[in-house]
Swiss-Prot record:
The lineage of its organism: Bacteria, Pseudomonadati, Pseudomonadota, Gammaproteobacteria, Alteromonadales. This is Queuine tRNA-ribosyltransferase. It catalyses: 7-aminomethyl-7-carbaguanine + guanosine(34) in tRNA = 7-aminomethyl-7-carbaguanosine(34) in tRNA + guanine. The active site is at 89 (proton acceptor), 264 (nucleophile). Its EC number is 2.4.2.29. It comes from Shewanella oneidensis (strain ATCC 700550 / JCM 31522 / CIP 106686 / LMG 19005 / NCIMB 14063 / MR-1). Pathway: tRNA modification; tRNA-queuosine biosynthesis. Its cofactor is Zn(2+). Substrate binds at residues 89-93, 143, 187, 214. SUPFAM superfamilies: tRNA-guanine transglycosylase. Zn(2+) binds at residues 302, 304, 307, 333. HAMAP family: Q_tRNA_Tgt. Homodimer. Within each dimer, one monomer is responsible for RNA recognition and catalysis, while the other monomer binds to the replacement base PreQ1.
Length: 374
């Protein structure tokens, strides 16, 4: 992987990630394909929304279908017929989400399979091996996602163990002679000094890119912004910056303003299946009865297949009837909305008009522009 940085506007960055399988324009949003599919979508449909790269879930793909079946197909690209770049998370967040059915030790994590209750062990070495089998273009280190809230002492112990796991991840990645890219994950909860220590340790190990982890886990939005404003300027300018698991459209805008290059989130797809649709004028809840006889498109400013061909009334009808097509059309729209937002942000950075773009974004939704700390 090669990262090119073209231009900046304030802290916002316009660039690209160049892989053997294709180029990813940044800032970029990665749709989430947890089980090797963006729910309800073919790879061609996902690509048509403007997506350059997908995120796959190491934990879930390891449990089902497993490494052996993946290898029989070649890798995850072949298995799901997506021949463009794929980033896989390490499984750390999913293990963290298991709660009481997992036990974290220095060696790794013991847990019971959420599928059949089988006892399973996952550690940094195994995570690297699974992601190698998946053929991930971007591999994420195995870390512990520090829960929120956490005391400073709890966050320090978690972060320091994640650093030790980062070194083990690096060593195993190198032992496997994996030709792809490995990203480190900055932890430290809401404590700036711990974030500093984490980043310093990761840079000493050496990675191809750096993710900001442990955010969007329940902390106030102000804390997320504060940590990003503190951490991003310290990350080497020639390395991509990835904000994991984020987020709402406004979170993407605020992340870009603070220097983030990559995002992923289940929100556009999950919300689509629940009739919660993002538009240029804010959120539309298509299940609301007001849309029952509305012949207008979902968003007249959107160029997606859904908006060009169907009315709000039709989408309302499909949702009321629990038709699969409704969820699919909603997903097409939400994913295209996210990609159009990223296209707009990239264009604004290129032309030095990001402030105006951000103002228009918030004004169209009747909201004030959040402050950006100098």
């Amino acid at each position: 992987m090669k990262f090119e940085l073209d231009t900046t506007d304030g802290r916002a960055r316009r660039g690209r990630l160049i892989f053997d399988r294709g180029t990813v324009e940044t800032p970029a949003f990665m749709p989430v394909g947890t089980y090797g599919t963006v729910k309800g979508m073919t790879p061609e449909e996902v690509r048509a929304t403007g997506a350059d790269i997908l995120l796959g879930n190491t934990f879930h793909l390891w449990l089902r279908p497993g490494e052996e079946i993946m290898r029989k197909h070649g890798d995850l690209h072949d298995f799901m017929n997506w021949q463009r770049p794929i980033l896989t998370d390490s499984g750390g967040f999913q293990v963290f989400s298991l709660g009481d059915i997992r036990k974290i030790t220095e060696e790794g994590v013991h847990f019971r399979s959420p599928i059949n209750g089988e006892k399973i062990f996952l550690d940094p070495e195994k995570s690297m091996q699974i992601q190698h089998a998946l053929g991930s273009d971007v591999v994420m280190i195995f870390d512990e996602c520090t829960p929120y809230p956490a005391t400073e002492d709890e966050a320090r112990k978690s972060m320091q163990m994640s650093l030790r796991w980062a070194k083990r991840s690096r060593d195993e990645f190198d032992r496997l002679e994996n030709p792809n890219s490995l990203f480190g994950i900055i932890q430290g909860s809401v404590y700036e000094d711990l974030r500093d220590e984490s980043l310093k340790g990761l840079v000493e190990i050496g990675f191809d890119g750096y993710a900001v982890g442990g955010l969007a886990v329940g902390e106030p939005k102000e804390d997320m912004h504060r940590i990003l404003e503190h951490v991003c300027p310290q990350i080497l300018a020639d390395k991509p910056r990835y904000l994991m698991g984020v987020g709402k459209p406004e979170d993407l805008v605020e992340g870009v303003r603070r220097g983030i290059d990559m995002f992923d989130c289940v929100m556009p797809t999950r919300n689509a299946r629940n009739g919660h649709l993002f538009t240029s004028e804010g959120v539309i809840k298509i299940r609301n009865a007001r849309h029952r006889d509305d012949t207008s498109p979902l968003d007249p400013k959107c160029d997606c297949y859904t908006c060009k061909n169907y009315s709000r009334a039709y989408l309302y009808h499909l949702d009321r009837c629990n038709e699969i097509l409704g969820a699919r059309l909603n997903t097409i729209h939400n994913l295209r909305y996210y990609q159009m937002l990223m296209e707009g942000l990239r264009g604004a950075i290129e032309t030095g008009t990001l402030d105006a773009f951000v103002k228009d974004f918030y004004t169209s939704q009747g909201r004030e522009v959040p402050e950006l700390v100098d």
